[in-house]
Amino acid sequence: MKGIILFISCLMLIDVVVESRDAYPADWRGCKFSCFWGSSSWCNEECTSLGGSSGYCAWPACWCYGLPDSVRYYNNKCHK
């Protein structure tokens, strides 16, 4: 039983240390990367080049999964 608790605790610690987020990546102004329907392959390439696990076009902007914390993401200040 102690082994199971230790294992679960380690998994939780790894999740805290290797944190990532799902978000709209942003350019230098804080604005989203625009895309159109059917450009999911372009968004996937952009997201993986930023260190994310994958991405797709959630029109009108790219949505990325697993972005590292160091990547800038959309924060509503751009109003676009």
From Swiss-Prot:
Residues 21-79 form the LCN-type CS-alpha/beta domain. One of its GO terms (cellular component) is extracellular region. Gene3D superfamilies: Knottin, scorpion toxin-like (3.30.30.10). Keywords: Disulfide bond, Ion channel impairing toxin, Neurotoxin, Secreted, Signal, Toxin, Voltage-gated sodium channel impairing toxin. Pfam families: Toxin_3. GO terms for biological process: defense response. Transmembrane segments: none annotated. Residues 1-20 form the signal peptide. Disulfide bonds join C31-C78, C35-C57, C43-C62, C47-C64. Its main location: secreted. It is found in: Secreted. Expressed by the venom gland. One of its GO terms (molecular function) is sodium channel inhibitor activity. InterPro entries: LCN-type_CS_alpha_beta_dom, Scorpion_toxin-like, Scorpion_toxin-like_sf, Scorpion_toxinL, Scorpion_toxinL/defensin. Has the structural arrangement of an alpha-helix connected to antiparallel beta-sheets by disulfide bonds (CS-alpha/beta). Belongs to the long (4 C-C) scorpion toxin superfamily. Sodium channel inhibitor family. Beta subfamily. Inhibits the sodium (Nav) currents in an apparent irreversible manner. Produces small depolarization and induces repetitive firing in squid axons. Is specific for arthropods (crickets, triatomides, crabs and squids), but is non-toxic to mice. This is Toxin TdNa1. It comes from Tityus discrepans. The lineage of its organism: Eukaryota, Metazoa, Ecdysozoa, Arthropoda, Chelicerata.
